[in-house]
Regions:
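Intrinsically disordered, low-complexity terminal regions enriched in Ser/Thr/Pro/Gly
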Residues: 1-138
């Protein structure tokens, strides 16, 4: 019907492993997702499909992010809720937002393949998106 908006769903427009992140779309990609023990591993994400709140002449979003590391068999080695709590205010409705998270890979971490689980929660809509990506520690 004319005038009715389709409900939006939270989704990742861009999600990449990175060696370093400097800003919006300014990062050094790590396409293989391989990280050396004792170093910092980054994930760069651009997210869209979130709900917006409105107050006076401003639009705002509220997003939180959880992260976990699992074995390929699904055993959780590490998890942390709310590693990022994001509230941003805008004059115009944004198409997307970007952020990064990082993990310091312990020097003693066993070499091998793992699964990073990144959960993005839209606090205004009450929805969440779970993204699983393989990562290798060497």
């Amino acid at each position: 019907f004319a005038g009715e908006e389709e409900p939006v769903s939270l989704y990742i427009e861009k999600g990449e492993w990175a060696y370093e992140v400097r800003g919006d779309d300014d990062y050094d990609p790590n396409p293989e997702g391989r990280f050396k023990r004792g170093e910092r591993g980054y994930a760069y994400l651009e997210v869209a499909g979130f709900d917006l709140g409105r107050e006076d002449d401003f639009y705002f979003l509220r997003i939180s992010v959880d992260v976990a590391l699992e074995t390929k068999n699904g055993f959780t080695l590490f998890s942390q809720k709310d590693v990022l709590e994001l509230e941003e205010w805008y004059l115009e409705p944004p198409k997307n937002t970007w952020f990064y998270i990082y993990v310091n890979i312990p020097w003693w971490a066993p070499r091998g393949g793992y699964v990073a689980v990144i959960t993005v929660r839209d606090l205004l809509a009450g929805t969440e998106l779970v993204e699983k990506r393989e990562v290798e520690v060497y």
